[in-house]
A protein has these predicted regions:
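Bacterial N-terminal signal peptides
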Residues: 1-8
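Aromatic-Pro/Gly-enriched surface loop or interdomain linker
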Residues: 12-69, 73-76, 166, 172-175, ...
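Short alpha-beta junction capping motif
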Residues: 17, 69-108
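Extracytoplasmic/secreted envelope proteins and their assembly/folding machinery
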Residues: 32-39, 85, 89, 107, ...
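Sec-exported extracytoplasmic/periplasmic mature domains
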Residues: 43-47, 90-93, 115-119, 207-208
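Surface-exposed patches in mature extracellular/periplasmic domains of secreted proteins
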Residues: 49-57, 100-103, 121-129
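Short, surface-exposed beta-strand/loop micro-motifs that present aromatic residues
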Residues: 59-60, 151-167
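Acidic, glycine-rich loop-and-strand cores that form catalytic or ligand-binding grooves
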Residues: 112-143
């Protein structure tokens, strides 16, 4: 209740996002050029005015309540303490949004951590008709495949609270790699474009919902 009260008092910027720093040994800091590039793309193509240098906030910090959108990524282990799990849950139930992009290898650890934060909820796959795929840019086939890795199909998985999508987990897609500077992965321009457009859709959807 105290956290929720602080959330109401905090000067929350209308359009700001932050990187979520978590414990467990996973590289929460992966893809350092990804988010700034996505923000720049959104500011140029989606009418946003997001700070191009996103802040970093820890899962258990009250600072997360200052941001309507959090981004999380990595390859490895993810661990939430009881207090961190409660803080994240309160943030999301209070109107926040979390996008988690699997940088390949994160999924099994993340799902365990999410079970702790949301013991009564499950990740459910979004179908291709979900509005998140039809915001500024149209993705009739759903989440695009950016990097092949093991060739599995990309999935957009969500957690809902009171019919609102509060958490989006994108896996087997690697959107963040597509947002990075062109020199990092040497992706074709068309691949980077798809990744950035899907990212813009996610941000646009989160800001409106």
């Amino acid at each position: 209740m105290i956290i929720a009260y602080l959330y109401c008092l905090a000067p929350a910027p209308a359009q700001e996002i932050a990187v979520l720093k978590y414990k467990g040994g996973g590289d929460w800091y992966a893809n350092p050029t990804a988010l700034p590039n996505l923000i720049r793309f959104c500011n140029e193509n989606a009418g946003t005015t997001i700070d191009e240098k996103p802040e970093t906030v820890e899962v258990g910090s009250s600072s997360i309540f200052q941001y309507p959108f959090l981004h999380m990524t990595g390859h490895g282990n993810v661990v939430f303490s009881d207090e961190e799990a409660e803080n994240l849950r309160t943030y999301l139930y209070s109107g926040g949004f979390l996008h988690i992009d699997d940088n390949y290898g994160m999924a099994p650890y993340l799902k365990k951590a999410l079970t702790k934060a949301f013991p009564d909820k499950e990740l459910v796959e979004l179908d291709r008709e979900h509005p998140i795929f039809n915001q500024l840019f149209k993705f009739p086939d759903g989440l695009p495949k950016i990097h092949e890795h093991d060739g599995k199909r990309p999935q957009a998985l969500g957690i809902f609270h009171e019919n609102r999508l509060i958490l989006l987990f994108t896996t087997e897609s690697d959107l963040g790699d597509g947002w990075e500077d062109p020199s990092v992965h040497n992706d074709p321009e068309e691949v980077r474009k798809k990744a950035l457009q899907m990212g813009a859709n996610i941000i646009a959807y989160a800001f409106k919902n």
